[in-house]
Amino acid sequence: MLGALFLSTAASAAVQSIDKVVAIVDNDVVMQSQLDQRVHEVQQTIAKRGGGVPPTSVLEQQVLERLIVENLQLQIGERSGIRITDEELNQAIGTIAQRNSMSIEQFRAALAHDGLSYEDARDQVRREMIISRVRQRRVAERIQVSEQEVKNFLASDLGKMQLSEELHLANILIPTPESANSEAIQSAARQAMEVYQQLKQGADFAQLAIARSGSDNALEGGDMGWRKAAQLPPPFDRELSAMAVGDITQPARTPGGFIILKLLDKRGGGNQVRDEVHVRHILIKPSEIRSEEETKRLAQKLYDRIEAGEDFAELAKSYSEDPGSALNGGDLNWIDPNALVPEFREVMAKTPQGQLSKPFKSPYGWHVLEVLGRRATDSTSQAREQQAMTVLRNRKYDEELQTWLRQIRDEAYVEIKLPGAEQAAQ
């Protein structure tokens, strides 16, 4: 997320003194300065990948369309009361810095070096977090996958085949409106075939995606990342497994339009070995009547009492405020570390077996933990069930997200004022 934060944004310093509206989007607008800055970031991204940069006029239309759809989602977030607290934002910024092996101060310095202010970066992260939550509420929470669907998938030839490999894909989507008539569908089909013929003649896939694709990943050259083939709509699910790396599919109609896929890479599966830790803990939470400092002191006192010989389980039953484990003496049983919050996982990883951790803080409160054991288990069966669940959820989510984005775009009032762009008002 947010690779663009490390791109030069010198364009923002060159914004004209008189800004202007390039699109009216329901109750908001997109400004020329926003468009210029985002176009510059995209140009930098493409250049860093070593690709040819499309004409600015082509990029402007693609970027403007993305800004319009982002704006609509942010307006939905505003109407829905979605807010990102400073604490949540700080935590997200910290995670981004950590992923780039930086401290916050190093992260600030890197941003300044690339011409981007820390406040601009925070605003960008906040917007992405709001959009993520809007999509979670409007799309992801509606996705349901039944146990029977998982069983059917695992029993199918397709399921057995696809769970053994992952595919790195890119796509080009020629969209069709939700209520498209036959003429619009035929026009989209012709455009898709034109793109396909250009690709067969050696045109660069990423550049064509940037110039022609209507997918929300167009500006990334259509890169979809790693996917299970079974996530994809038919007929691609079976077709891709038989393809060689570098091959492209012929255009096929999907609910969102006509799509062309390129197979960038493959990787295989094998047995799944999972590390598990047997751990117990005591959780003390701050409250209206107990301050953060008092909570920390209580956790320290409990640590001292356990170190002095008192029984961990009895103290957990008496003091722990984790309803899921307190009655079991704080025992979380054997657990996958990846299921735990990073703060808990990191302390647990550093604590030797049979020893206590010093009191530490997580988003839930203050903890003292004890590692009782470690093991590696063959979780192939469980992993395959989880993979099947993920594949089916992702397949449904991808289809629902594209449908929903197209729906909110079609239903919005949008007036494009960018010179040379197609005029639209709804």
Swiss-Prot record:
Primary residence: periplasm
A Pfam family hit: SurA_N
GO cellular component: outer membrane-bounded periplasmic space
One GO MF term: unfolded protein binding
Keyword Transport: no
Annotated catalysed reactions: [protein]-peptidylproline (omega=180) = [protein]-peptidylproline (omega=0)
Entry keyword annotation includes Isomerase: yes
Domain PpiC per the UniProt entry, residue ranges: 164-265, 274-373
Localization, UniProt: Periplasm
Domain note: The PPIase activity resides only in the second parvulin domain. The N-terminal region and the C-terminal tail are necessary and sufficient for the chaperone activity of SurA. The PPIase activity is dispensable for SurA to function as a chaperone. The N-terminal region and the C-terminal tail are also required for porin recognition.
Function: Chaperone involved in the correct folding and assembly of outer membrane proteins. Recognizes specific patterns of aromatic residues and the orientation of their side chains, which are found more frequently in integral outer membrane proteins. May act in both early periplasmic and late outer membrane-associated steps of protein maturation.
PANTHER family (alphabetical): CHAPERONE SURA
Protein's name according to its UniProt entry: Chaperone SurA
